[in-house]
Every structure is written in C-alpha cells, then in structure tokens.
Amino acid sequence: MTELHALRDAYRSDKAALLAAMKATGASTRGIRVLLRKLSSLAGNLLQTLWQRAQLPDDMALVAVGGFGRDQLFPYSDVDVLLLLPDGTAPEAGSALRTKLEGFIGSCWDTGLEIGSSVRTVAECLAESAGDVTVQTSLLESRLVCGNAALFAEFQRQYRAQTVSYTHLTLPTTPYV
C-alpha cells in the first residue's frame, strides 16, 4: 500500500502545482487548453503506472474516453476510461481476470484518480453505443492510453464503420467521405 500512497501523494502534488500555476498566471484561453492537456497527461501517466502494476493480460487495452479521450481533463472532472477486452472474454466472478480488474480500478481510486470506468469487449461497445447516444459520443472521443494497440485499432475500425453507417441511415442526405 505504501507504493500507492506515494503515487497518490505525487499525483495530488503535481495536480495542485498545475492548478496553482494556472491561478497565478490568470491563464488565457490558450493557457487553459495547455492546462487541460497537462492534467490529462498527468492522469494518463498515473494510469499507465497502475496498469503495469496490475499485470493485466497483454490482449487488453486501456482506453481514454470522453473529455479525457479528447486529451482535455478539466480540474474536477472524473477520468473516464474503458477497459477493453477482446471479444469472447468474460471476467466471471471469482476469476483471476476479474480480481485483477477490480484491483486496477481500486488502485485508481486509492491514488486519487476519480475514474468512471467500464469493462467491455469490442462487441459490447458496439451494442451499447447503438442503444445509447451518450455511450456513442463518449466512444467517439477515444484514444489508447496503454495496452494492446491492435485491439484498440480493431475497436476503432468497427466502431467507426457502425457509427458512419448508422448516421448515414439516420441522415441519408448528409455526405460522407
């Protein structure tokens, strides 16, 4: 637990320093954009450390979604992440995978990251986004934080194909490239 406390203290200190610098300079719009990217980077670096510490399987990916996916983390916003699993993976209760996932999410909270997390396969992401526009929008603004880049690329390919197809069916007069 000592390592988590050290990570928490470093995260809090670095975040406080960024916010203090912004307040001291009376940041302009451009300055605020830089701050949002720096806060996003700070959270992303901590997530990468926690991901490695959790020793999650190599076939998984940690994906930033929503504002965090845009690389714009507002000072008091939660950090929205998707723990992306390959299709056919089900973290059953009591399984080693589920234990590792719960440990990773718990470590995030223990270090001061207020995360909003979902654990889904690519197929589950597609199904959820087809039925919920908030999920669809959140996934639209996604980027890989760490983990399996090929899985993330496959998710993006399928998600974009579904989203463009759905949008075109809904708005048939809209031109698409």
Outline where the language-model segments fall.
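Catalytic cores of NTP-dependent nucleotidyl/adenyl transfer enzymes across multiple folds
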Residues: 114, 141-169
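Single conserved hydrophobic/aromatic residue that forms the stacking wall/gate
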Residues: 168-177
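Active-site nucleotide-donor binding segment shared across nucleotidyl transfer reactions
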Residues: 43-92, 98
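Intrinsically disordered, low-complexity coil segments
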Residues: 23-31, 87-96
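Generic recognition of stable, solvent-exposed alpha-helical segments in well-folded globular domains
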Residues: 38-45, 96-99, 103, 134, ...
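Conserved catalytic core of two-metal-ion nucleotidyltransferases
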Residues: 48, 98-146
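Long, hydrophobic, amphipathic alpha-helical segments used as structural scaffolds
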Residues: 26, 50-58, 112-119, 163-166
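N-terminal regions immediately upstream of nucleotidyltransferase
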Residues: 1-58, 76
